C-alpha cells in the first residue's frame, strides 16, 4: 500500500517542466553534453556485435553473436535463465571487464569504434552507455546528491547548475513532486519503485545515448512496473534502450525488436510482433508459447 501511495504522488504526465527546460542554465548543461559528444546521433546502428563469443574461464556463455541495434529503438533480450543474455548486456558497456576469468572474442562497436579500443576510455563509455540494474542501487548519500553524482564526476555542471540538473531529471522521471521537500533525505527512505526511478534519474543526468536495463522491474510491484514501462516509452527516440527481461508480456509491450537467446546462442531476432506471432525457429516458438522456460 505504501508503494502505491508513493507512486500516486508522482506526476503521471512523465514530462519535463517546460519552464525549467527553457532556463538558461538547462541550455548551458545541454550545450556541455553536446560538446562532450560531437558525434551523437549519427549512425543508424549505434551498437553492433560482430561474431561475439563471451565466457568466464573455460566456460563459454555466448557464441557467435551477430546483431546490430538501431538508434532510437527499444530491443528486448529474452530467453531462459542461463542463456547468456545478461552476460551479453553487461559486456556492451564493459561491466564484465573486472569479473574473474572474463574473456571475449569478436568485437562490439559503439558508433563504429570498438568498445575495447583506445577511442573509448572506460569512464566516458559508461557515461554514454548507461545502465539500470535489477534491484535499485541508490548511493549512500542524499536524494539530490544521488542524481548529480555522475554529473559532478564528469564535470558536466557545478554549483547551482547541479540543482537545476537534479530538478530537471527528477521531473523527467516523475519523481520531483514526491521528493522536492526532502532532497537532503536518505534515498533508502523511498519505496522500492521510487528508488528505481531515482536510479534512472541518476543514469539520465549524464546524458547517455544508450541505456542498458537488466530486468529493471523484476523486483518491483505491478504498479511500479507499469509506471516504469510507460516512462521508458518516453525516452525513445532520444535514447536507444536494450532491456533484458524474463517477462514475455513486458517484452511484447515495451520493445520494437526482440532477440531470443537459448543455450548460449542468439537463435532468432526481429521485429517484436513478428517474432512472437510468427517465430521462424522451433525453439523460439516453444519459448514464447511457454513450453520451455
Walk through the language-model features, giving the residues of each:
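ABC ATPase "signature
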Residues: 269-270
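The feature captures the beta-strand-to-loop junction immediately N-terminal to the Walker
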Residues: 78-80
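Catalytic Walker B motif of ABC-type/P-loop ATPase nucleotide-binding domains
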Residues: 211-214
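ABC ATPase NBD coupling module
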Residues: 101-104, 114-130, 153, 275-279
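Conserved ABC ATPase "signature" region
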Residues: 107-114, 159-181
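Conserved signature/switch motifs of ABC ATPase nucleotide-binding domains
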Residues: 206, 237
